[in-house]
Amino acid sequence: MALKLNPFLSQTQKLPSFALPPMASTRSPKFYMASTLKSGSKEVENLKKPFMPPREVHVQVTHSMPPQKIEIFKSLDNWAEENILVHLKPVEKCWQPQDFLPDPASDGFDEQVRELRERAKEIPDDYFVVLVGDMITEEALPTYQTMLNTLDGVRDETGASPTSWAIWTRAWTAEENRHGDLLNKYLYLSGRVDMRQIEKTIQYLIGSGMDPRTENSPYLGFIYTSFQERATFISHGNTARQAKEHGDIKLAQICGTIAADEKRHETAYTKIVEKLFEIDPDGTVLAFADMMRKKISMPAHLMYDGRDDNLFDHFSAVAQRLGVYTAKDYADILEFLVGRWKVDKLTGLSAEGQKAQDYVCRLPPRIRRLEERAQGRAKEAPTMPFSWIFDRQVKL
């Protein structure tokens, strides 16, 4: 990405601190697909264009973790079996999307759908923009499994590896898969959204991938997932609360159930990082500071619908305005993780480790101060058409 991800914005749009700044030049031809055609040819450019991310990604750094540290994760396989796999649920005890939706085999199916659609009529457009954005994020699950399988020392080497790390990744993916399925079916039945535009956005997003800047390092990767799972827990929890306020108890139950899953997954990922702090406090605090200096980018930051190159920024601005996921949440999550991992109490660190410790411990209040200043300078937010809701205008 040509511009650094910057959480401290003072634009006219009230963008949250985790949003990416708009790009002056988008859909750049700097992205190359493997091809037998000659590079630079018009044919190559035409083939590549539909598959390019809507914005540039960072210079890619790979395999930054020293090879000897891979042994740490191999040695933790039994620990992961006993301490991480316990946060998975047996399939037979898991909820399924059908538990919350009209039964298509029931004689009352048509009536159940009518009731769902009547409830959905009472929900405002801006809420649906956020719910659709959350659903699209969940539906890009193939990207997230791919990301986990880039991590050295914990990846699924065969596709059916029996290691605890590989089992976790596959089973976590299987549990998460229900989230997008459930929200997708609800939105389809609601009649409030343009499903074809949503489906295009999902395809674009999966094709674009993501740019978490985790460098194949499980230190960076598990810090990232710890942050993300808590962020999705907060986001789905807030959509549940607001659905209830809008009178749709069933939708509130859907969002709340998904939030509970995210909380359980957050517990697993934060436990992994807690163990890394125990084994390698210096390396782990350096990784924590590294991820926070880069700024945590949301998994769907390359979102695109075929029209709006800054779609993620616009979706994020609506989420910020509604209080679904905000700059304050970003700072609160960081503060929570600092406390959860007892970063302020680490001792015996190197000089660089102490600097990293000081940086992450001081960062939450700094983020809050800068965000307050940005909000104070922000002008009246514009409105924007969203293709997901048939180009109806929504205030950012």
Swiss-Prot record:
InterPro entries: FADS-2_CS, Fatty_acid_desaturase-2, Ferritin-like_SF, RNR-like. Higher levels in developing seeds than in leaf and root tissues. Pathway: Lipid metabolism; fatty acid metabolism. The keyword Repressor does not apply. It is found in: Plastid, Chloroplast; Plastid. GO terms for biological process: fatty acid biosynthetic process. It is an enzyme of class 1 (oxidoreductase). GO terms for molecular function: metal ion binding; stearoyl-[ACP] desaturase activity. Its main location: plastid. Fe cation 2 binds at E176, E229, E262, H265. Its EC number is 1.14.19.2. Converts stearoyl-ACP to oleoyl-ACP by introduction of a cis double bond between carbons 9 and 10 of the acyl chain. Its cofactor is Fe(2+). GO terms for cellular component: chloroplast. Belongs to the fatty acid desaturase type 2 family. PROSITE patterns: FATTY_ACID_DESATUR_2. This is Stearoyl-[acyl-carrier-protein] 9-desaturase, chloroplastic. It comes from Ricinus communis (Castor bean).
